[in-house]
């Protein structure tokens, strides 16, 4: 009997040990998770397969129990965690910044405030030489060219973080658009 139990436990342990860990969600942490997965497999022999499909997709998959863990850049409410019998904890911390491609400006050289950024994303500031941008960049020559606003098209934790910030710095943004993983962008090009 003892030999049978030991054999059974060994078989279960080998089966459990052979199972890969699966995860899905936010694109932001993928490079870090890939490095961690490589180190974890080397140390334990257990694979970690992470699908970088966006925060909303990760939440859907963990809620549907098709993955071992989900990842999102946006916090999940306590109510939803309780409903799904889940826990959350921070794994990686990062920031979101606007990217500007404007001739004559080096990275970090263009000055812009949160409220003005909200106006750009709402479409009320639509040209680089808008007086509000000119006032923030004295001595710089801003072109009379349209601003093309680009954002993610899918549900995204990065979108949540960005719109959360714009909601904090602009009452008009808060009233018209608000915060969320997916919002109706007033001025945009989806990617």
Show where each model-derived region lies:
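Flexible loop/hinge segments at secondary-structure junctions
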Residues: 18-191
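Positively charged n-region of N-terminal signal peptides that target proteins for export
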Residues: 1-4
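Hydrophobic h-region of N-terminal signal peptides that target proteins for export
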Residues: 6-18
């Amino acid at each position: 009997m003892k030999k049978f139990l030991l054999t059974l436990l060994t078989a279960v342990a080998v089966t459990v040990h052979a199972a890969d860990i699966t995860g899905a969600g936010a694109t932001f942490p993928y490079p870090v998770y890939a490095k961690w997965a490589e180190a974890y497999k080397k140390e334990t022999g257990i694979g970690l397969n992470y699908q970088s499909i966006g925060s909303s997709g990760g939440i859907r998959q963990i809620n549907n129990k098709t993955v071992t863990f989900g990842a999102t850049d946006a916090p999940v409410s306590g109510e939803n965690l309780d409903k799904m019998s889940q826990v959350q904890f921070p794994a990686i911390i990062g920031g979101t910044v606007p990217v500007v491609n404007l001739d004559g400006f080096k990275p970090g050289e263009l000055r812009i405030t949160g409220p003005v950024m909200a106006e750009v994303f709402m479409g009320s500031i639509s040209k680089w030489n808008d007086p509000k941008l000119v006032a923030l960049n004295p001595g710089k020559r801003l072109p009379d060219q349209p601003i093309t606003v680009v954002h993610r098209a899918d549900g995204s934790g990065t979108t949540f973080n960005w719109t959360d910030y714009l909601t904090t710095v602009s009452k008009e943004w808060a009233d018209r658009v608000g915060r969320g993983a997916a919002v109706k962008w007033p001025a945009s090009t989806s990617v």
